[in-house]
Every structure is written in structure tokens, then in C-alpha cells.
Amino acid sequence: DTGHQTYVHKLLTGRNSEFDGLRQPGEISGYPSRAESSHDWIENSHASTVLAYAHGLATADATRGGSRRVVAVIGDGSMTGGMAFEGLNNLGHSGLKVTIVLNDNGRSYAPTVGRLSESLIRIRSNPTYMRRQRRLEDIAESLPWVGELLERSISATKAALRDMFEPTAFFEALGVHYLGPFDGHDIAEIEDALRNAAEFDGPVVVHLLTQTVRGHVPAE
């Protein structure tokens, strides 16, 4: 979602040598462009459009008898837009295989409003939840004889805690499964979450908590 955030995608799909000409006449676009690369499946500029694109791509694949899972990445600010809500509603109704990666970093050009935004803020502003989750997992790994049993117990506890947060009810009411929140800076955890999401037949939200430009102290 939000096409001007496509720069890293362009760098990873063979256009790094052309980057000096970004947004210049006759050079590469600052947005996804299907005419520019076969890796650009959609063309969008500003926010809340990607779920509609995902619905269209998944519908086209299913119509042709395919079984591919479409993955859409959207920020918490864009998720509060009306078009995103419409896309969620359509995906939940259709039951299509779409994974929605919700990149929740608390950033948008203007303050977000509404119940979903308030719920995401409450989770993001409660670092204790993530710290306690990590501490329990570390303890489980350090106890070889009870580790497996404790890990199963922790997984059940984490699921119960997540069900207490409003986003779960919001997405599930629309027919979209919800997984999370997860540490968006833990690659192994993200990979596990995406593998789990792929096991569902219908649409799934994978909620990642991230910090913009993390690791670059002057920008943090």
C-alpha cells in the first residue's frame, strides 16, 4: 500500500543501477509501474488501495483454477481508510486466500481516527506485553525437560491474551482471521507467522509491531 514506499521493492527487483534517475523524466517512476517491471503487479500512489488490488488478484487466480496465496502489505494508517474497510469486507465475504501483513508503526501523515486505530494504539503503547512474551519464551528454551510442555502452555496463553484485544474481534467479525501481534523486527518470528497464515484457507491478518527506521539512531 502507498506506492511511494516502493523504493526497497525496486532495489530488490533489479532497478538499483537506475536509482540515480528516480522520478526524473524518462527514468524510473517513484511508484509501482507495470510498464516498468514485471515485478510491479499493481500501480498505486496513496493510501488504502492495496486490499482492493489483493481481492482482484486473488479473484483472477481463483477464476483460472489457481491456488496461489496473495500477500498484501498495509500500514496501520492506511488500514483505517474507507477503501481498506471495503477491501476487508470483500475479502472476508469471498473467503479468498489472502495474507494481509499489517505493518503497525504508528506513523501516518495525519492523525488516524476510529475504533480500530484506538485499539492498535493501545497494543502498540503497551511494550510490557511484548517483553513478557519474549521472557517466557526464553525461560521455556532454557528448561530442557519441561521446555516443550511449557512452550505449549505459553502458546495457549499468548493466544488467549491476543483474543482479549479488540483487533481480533474486529477482523474476525468480517470473516478475516487475525494472528498477532508479533515483533516486526524478529525475522524468525515473522517467518513462522507467515507459514502459519498460509495454513488458513481464507484471508488472514498478520499483525506486526514495528518502529520506523529502527537501528538508525538519528532518525529514531
Which residue stretches match the model-derived regions?
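Extended low-complexity acidic/polar segments
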Residues: 92-98, 108
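Asparagine-centered polar/low-complexity signal
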Residues: 89-90, 103-105
